[in-house]
Amino acid sequence: GRMGHTLVEKISARSDCRIVAGVDQKAGQIGDIPVYASLEDLPEAKGIVIDFTSPAGTVHAAQFCAAHGMPCVLCSTGLSKEDEAVVEQASEKVPVFRSANMSVGINVLIELARRATKLFDGEFDIEIVEKHHHNKLDAPSGTALMIANAINEEAGGKYEYVYDRHVVRQKRGAQELGISSVRGGGIVGDHDVLFCGPEEVVTISHVAQSRGGFADGAVQAALFLDGCEPGYYTMTDMLKGKMQCL
């Protein structure tokens, strides 16, 4: 897929790691890199798996890696609670890095949104608007939910997420956190967090201009996992030192 080709481009330009093989429904070759139809077809179960497939593919990758002692970076969105439970079980046996968005910039946005939530202390209404290409299947995006969950955690869990305002004709409640989705064209990924007060609006924005940022983050995560003990790791763990300066 597109992320697979982007990963090949990014990793090929580095000297601290290399691609052993790829996995895709269509087996074949990308340059000198063999591509297999499934993880089970790999000649050797070694290295670190980076997964950008689908919820079903992510669950399978987590189970395969747990069974073969392979660390994994799982980047797909749209996972159910049952899917996430499988991922957490895998993390008991191998290092698992999980994030719905591998962009370092998005994770800085999340930290800034946390800080703003604390500073405004419930005095501002909060809305999240996410925009993606017309082929994206899940809505709202996994990233929008990551942002909402971080805000809600900072606020003590008081917010109720509202996704569809047209079904109810009533004024906005103080405990609502609205999440709106836009799908169109080739938008890679835009996220805006709006803190709306009576006299002013503060907007924190992130715009992904290409898929390269996601690939870079995934490679950094794989390098971070090298040598880690089994466990469930996130961007917060990887960026802990840098986040302290915010």
Can you name each region flagged by the protein language model?
Residues 2-43, 122-246:
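C-terminal substrate-binding/catalytic lobe of Rossmann-fold NAD(P)-dependent oxidoreductases
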Residues 19, 35, 72-73, 96-98:
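Hydrophobic beta-strand scaffold residues
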Residues 42-50, 66-72:
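Short acidic/histidine-rich motifs immediately flanking catalytic phosphotransfer sites
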Residues 53-54, 77, 181-183:
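Short glycine-/small-residue-rich Rossmann-like dinucleotide-binding loops
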Residues 59-68, 75-98, 104-116:
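Rossmann-fold NAD(P)-binding glycine/threonine-rich loop
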